Regions:
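Extracytoplasmic gate region of multi-pass secondary transporters
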Residues: 34, 230-278, 373-377
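Extracellular/periplasmic helix-loop-helix junction of adjacent transmembrane segments
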Residues: 37-67
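Helix-to-loop junctions at the C-terminal end of transmembrane segments
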Residues: 71-82, 283-295
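Cytoplasmic membrane-interface "Motif A"-like loop-to-helix N-cap segments
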Residues: 80-91, 292-304
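Glycine-rich segments within core transmembrane alpha-helices of 12-TM secondary carriers
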Residues: 151-172, 365-376
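C-terminal transmembrane helical hairpin of 12-TM major facilitator-type secondary transporters
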Residues: 297-343
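A late C-terminal transmembrane helix in Major Facilitator Superfamily
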Residues: 355-386
């Protein structure tokens, strides 16, 4: 990998795992909180069941608010002081936030201090996650051997999909083994603590990393103009927004199968398993193909297919309402989404110079998640109610992908090295 003094050193597999673990923990935390939102509401918030659940979900949402700030502060740190110290800071803050929430006393024990602490820890979690993505992605791109940048970046996304699977399995195991009262009292806390167990190991391994920010960039005077890259940032926002809407639409299929298609809970969770498995394979394939053929050439085909297939896939699910239709549509849509989204992110990253890469990625990613990730499922549920059409989410996803495709025209792909 390229180091700060221009030499090259190889990353070990454990070091790569330490870098991508942060992104995996992000998705593990999100899925775990979503899975146990009811139990968290009962434990930490006042009111009846409906009110406590609403407050619990609202607290999950506050984390989206602080993500852009984390992207700015920690991303700026990564571009000025180096990727390594920024990654150590963001991962440490993430561990504090997760353990803090897991150990927060109940509302019955400390009153309004419980929801206040929950909000504080979710804000800290969002801040750390906003600062985690940019430095990590920049590090992986800069550390990758020549011609392997796409594959290295794909590892970050594959880890996220793998974390979704692990979180689902942990949640199902705890809910199956524990009585409801135990799950409410302490069972949900175990799920968060299990995820936080990787933080000490990740921090220890991150301390062994070699800095990848070029020395001339780290020592350059602050305040260089970013104006020439505003168009690239806008294009990146639109592409990442399209990928985010598509991803959250596919994640919504578990809820969609239960509430709109009226399928069994076990069948609905099967869609999550399909999503995770296909996602991991698609991430790795998308990165490999981008290295071999170039980002634009790889992303155009899958995203054009997604434009064509989204509506028919939702029509098939709503018409047949069988596990085969649900799993088949999930697999096909996930594959074409992932094969296009991984190269799209890489295309944006490669267009940014090292001096603003971590901050640029972090801010654009955080804003995309805050604006689109936090609203997609709510909007799609509302669209189904307003239109009375079960395929409304497909049209929303199709429109987003069309905008993302148009945005690729604003970015010139650098020559592959």
């Amino acid at each position: 990998m390229a180091t700060g003094d221009g030499t090259r050193a190889a990353l070990t597999r454990r070091q790569i795992a330490a870098v991508v673990a942060g992104n995996g923990l992000e998705f593990y935390d999100f899925v775990t909180y979503s899975f146990f939102a009811t139990q968290i509401g009962r434990a930490l918030f006042p009111g009846d069941a409906a009110q406590s659940l609403l407050l619990s979900l609202a607290t999950l949402g506050v984390g989206f608010v602080s993500r852009p700030l984390g992207g700015i502060v920690i991303g700026r740190m990564a571009d000025r002081r180096g990727r390594k110290p920024a990654m150590i800071l963001s991962f440490a803050l993430m561990g504090i936030a997760i353990v803090g929430l897991a150990l927060t006393p109940s509302y019955a024990a400390i009153g309004m201090a419980a929801p206040a602490l929950a909000v504080l820890f979710r804000l800290l979690q969002g801040f750390s996650l906003g600062g985690e993505v940019g430095p990590n992605a920049a590090f992986l791109l800069e550390a990758a051997p020549p011609g392997r940048g796409g594959f290295y970046i794909s590892l970050q996304f594959a880890t996220a999909d793998l974390a979704v699977l692990v979180a689902g399995l942990v949640g199902l195991a705890l809910s199956s083994w524990l009585a409801p009262a135990d799950l409410d009292a302490w069972g949900w806390r175990i799920a968060f603590l299990l995820g936080a167990m990787i933080v000490p190991f990740g921090l220890a391994l991150r301390r062994t990393l070699v800095e990848t920010l070029p020395a001339e960039e780290a020592n350059a005077p602050a305040g260089g103009s970013v104006r020439p890259y505003l168009v690239i940032a806008l294009a990146g926002m639109l592409m990442l927004g399209a990928a985010t809407i598509s991803n959250y639409t596919l994640s919504y299929l578990t809820t969609y199968a239960q509430t709109t298609l009226h399928m069994a809970v076990s069948t609905a969770f099967g869609a999550t398993v399909v999503l995770g498995l296909v996602g991991v394979l698609g991430d790795l394939a998308g990165g490999w193909l981008a290295d071999r053929y170039g980002c634009k050439r790889v992303l155009l085909g899958p995203w054009l297919l997604l434009l064509v297939l989204a509506v028919p896939a939702f029509l098939a699910m709503s018409a047949w309402r069988t596990p085969e239709a649900l799993f088949g549509a999930t697999a096909v849509l996930t594959l074409v989404h992932i094969l296009g989204s991984t190269p799209a992110v890489l295309l944006f990253m490669q267009a940014l110079p090292a001096r603003i890469r971590a901050g640029g990625i972090g801010i654009v990613y955080a804003l995309s998640i805050a604006l689109f990730g936090g609203t997609t499922q709510l909007l799609e549920t509302a669209l189904i109610r307003w239109t009375g059409s079960p395929i409304a989410p497909a049209w929303y996803m199709t429109g987003a992908i069309a905008v993302g495709l148009a945005a690729t025209l604003l970015i010139r792909e650098p020559k592959r090295r």
